[in-house]
């Protein structure tokens, strides 16, 4: 029985968890004394979060709250790609946060190159925005998982479809 085992390396997030994170953050912002009267809004777009608040100080506080709530809901802080803070109407501050999803071609090439050079008995192939890793040995696959975790990528990495 020489069957091959495999798994996929992906960068994805649960949209419902992001919605829950934003709801919890808004609830926290509306009850905090220093942020209560700032009329802060957090809006979720297709792949973006828009924060509209009173000042740079409150923007930093809202970012901290958002990341804290995300971590409590098992979302990686690497999920958020912060854009520039820009001034909005009425002396307010707006910031657009892009939600990272999918592995870029360059990062996928880094993963496959690392696998092919460090692990001779393991195959890696790029499949869209995921990387499929396959081998006959489950131990080799677990070693590859640890090696990929040790590489520092700007996006959150998950392992799915483990067979």
Curated annotation (Swiss-Prot):
GO terms for molecular function: nucleotide binding. It comes from the Bacteria. InterPro entries: DUF520, UPF0234-like_C, UPF0234_N, YajQ-like_sf. The keyword Protein biosynthesis does not apply. Keywords: Nucleotide-binding. The keyword Nucleotide-binding applies. PANTHER family: UPF0234 PROTEIN YAJQ. This is Nucleotide-binding protein SYNPCC7002_A1983. The lineage of its organism: Bacteria, Bacillati, Cyanobacteriota, Cyanophyceae, Oscillatoriophycideae.
